């Protein structure tokens, strides 16, 4: 195996012990990363090995008295004692769990096995002995408290939908956090742990949004064909008129992370709405934050259930909302969402325009390419490889179904992408050109998986807006101005 790195995990309350871990890469079995944990006595420099090359554990922290550890990992950690999935399912190890580990007995016990939210971070507070957990809770990001004595978990009544970060005092009953919601930017609060009261410390949102009009945001859920409730929401344009017909944009990730309610994000749904679109987003099967069973649906799926839910949700939304022009629906996603964009077009013709940013077109090439390919696929298609399931790798790849695509498709990609290499878009572009389909391909020079250069980001955003204007509003002028016809 190859040792990747060493990490400091925690320092004990009395400052005597240092908890550190090492990460080792193992190619020949799952998971490909194994962690070892050590306790270093800073007085004697003696090292106590807690565990070696353990799978599915991430990091650990001391309890206030130093007798236990709070361990973050996946449900499969510690021989699966935290696993809570159906028979026949494979765990999605991106779904985070917490465990208590007794240093004397060297035994672990699950804390969050029956707790649906996905654990992002946790702190064992020295002041009151409670554990504070930041987690994805459906499309919210919330803080919960857990009593380690009895395992009871309660929600902290924070004032924002998305808690971005938090900090606890060691010697006072106070928690500071900042966050945002679907229609406001970040605000900073102090929370009284005893009284349960929030006090606004600073409102950055007021300054940011003082000259901006936002449309309304509404929740909208539906039951899929198998009876699962699929959660979503929609954004209306400012000055919305229910008697008009609006084009609609459907946004999704479709992978293992939820599309949360944050105002500020790379794919701003309020921004699309401000341009005169209704925007519908949803969190289909496989998303974390909805319980381990729901998250496990992501494994070895690659669009199988997800596409059905996106198509069904889009059709039902149009049926129930007469203000949507069902002939003018666009869709957009990035990375796994870019894969979903491409895959959806092989399954349906309900979209009038589609955009794939950094999308995966062939599982067989992505699996072995990029910095994340085989590592991400060790979860997304655990145990499934090109040599033991060649039909799966072709059947679920948009490239191998390119002849079924009829929707005008825009492919966007940074040409320095180390996650999903640009070849994924190049080969889909080549296929669709050979097939005589409507496709455009825009490379962003020097950009990686996300477009972060300021001027390049503006150009990238305008490209998206212009593509939708061309196909959903019958206004091609913006696109022509950006990309005039050329004769070689």
Residue map of PLM features:
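Short beta-strand element of the alpha/beta-hydrolase
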Residues: 244-254
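A flexible loop/linker signature enriched in serine peptidases of the S9 family
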Residues: 3-6, 21-37, 51-61, 71-99, ...
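Active-site-proximal cap/loop segments of hydrolase catalytic domains
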Residues: 274, 281-488
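Non-catalytic accessory segments flanking enzyme active sites
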Residues: 3, 7-10, 15, 19-22, ...
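Residue-level detector of Asp-centered blade-edge/turn motifs that repeat once per structural unit
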Residues: 13-14, 64-65, 126-128, 170-171
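The serine-hydrolase catalytic nucleophile loop
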Residues: 253-269, 284, 423-424
């Amino acid at each position: 195996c190859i040792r990747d790195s060493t990490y400091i995990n925690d320092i004990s309350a009395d400052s005597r012990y240092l908890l550190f871990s090492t990460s080792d890469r193992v190619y020949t079995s799952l998971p490909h990363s194994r962690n070892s944990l050590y306790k270093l006595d800073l007085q004697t420099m003696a090292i106590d090995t807690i565990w070696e090359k353990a799978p599915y554990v991430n990091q650990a922290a001391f309890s206030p008295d130093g007798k236990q550890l709070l361990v973050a990992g996946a449900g499969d950690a510690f021989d699966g004692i935290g696993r809570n999935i159906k028979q026949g399912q494979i765990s999605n190890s991106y779904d985070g769990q917490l465990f208590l580990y007794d240093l004397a007995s060297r035994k672990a016990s699950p804390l969050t096995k029956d707790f649906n939210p996905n654990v992002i971070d946790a702190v064992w507070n020295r002041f009151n002995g409670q554990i504070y957990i930041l987690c994805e809770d459906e499309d919210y990001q919330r803080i919960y408290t857990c009593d380690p004595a009895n395992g009871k978990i309660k929600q902290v009544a924070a004032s924002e939908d998305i808690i971005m970060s938090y900090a606890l005092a060691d010697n006072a009953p106070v928690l500071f956090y900042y966050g945002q919601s679907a229609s406001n930017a970040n605000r900073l609060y102090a929370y009284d742990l005893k009284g349960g009261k929030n006090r606004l410390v600073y409102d950055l949102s007021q300054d940011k949004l003082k000259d901006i009009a936002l449309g309304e945001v509404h929740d909208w859920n539906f039951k899929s064909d198998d009876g699962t409730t699929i959660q979503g929401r929609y954004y209306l344009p400012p000055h919305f008129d229910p008697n008009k017909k609006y084009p609609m944009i459907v946004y999704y990730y479709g992978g293992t992370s939820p599309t949360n309610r944050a105002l500020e994000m790379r794919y701003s749904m309020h921004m699309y709405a401000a341009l005169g679109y209704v925007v519908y987003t949803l969190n289909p099967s496989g998303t974390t934050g909805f319980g381990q069973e729901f998250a496990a649906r992501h494994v070895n799926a690659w669009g199988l259930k997800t596409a059905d839910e996106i198509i069904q949700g889009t059709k039902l939304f149009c049926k129930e909302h007469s203000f949507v022009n069902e002939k003018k629906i666009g869709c957009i996603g990035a990375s796994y969402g870019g894969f979903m964009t491409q895959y959806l077009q092989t399954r349906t013709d309900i979209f009038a325009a589609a955009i794939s940013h950094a999308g995966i077109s062939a599982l067989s090439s992505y699996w072995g390419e990029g910095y994340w390919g085989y590592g991400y696929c060790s979860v997304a298609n655990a145990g499934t490889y090109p040599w033991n399931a060649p039909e799966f790798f072709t059947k679920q790849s948009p490239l191998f179904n390119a002849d079924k695509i009829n929707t005008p498709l825009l492919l966007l990609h940074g040409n320095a992408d180390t996650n999903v290499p640009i070849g994924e878009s190049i080969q889909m572009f080549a296929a669709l050109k050979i097939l005589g389909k409507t496709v455009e391909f825009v490379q962003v020079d020097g950009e990686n998986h996300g477009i972060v250069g300021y001027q390049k980001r503006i150009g990238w955003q305008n490209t998206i807006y212009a593509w939708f204007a061309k196909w959903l509003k019958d206004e091609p002028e913006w696109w022509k101005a950006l990309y005039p016809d050329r004769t070689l």
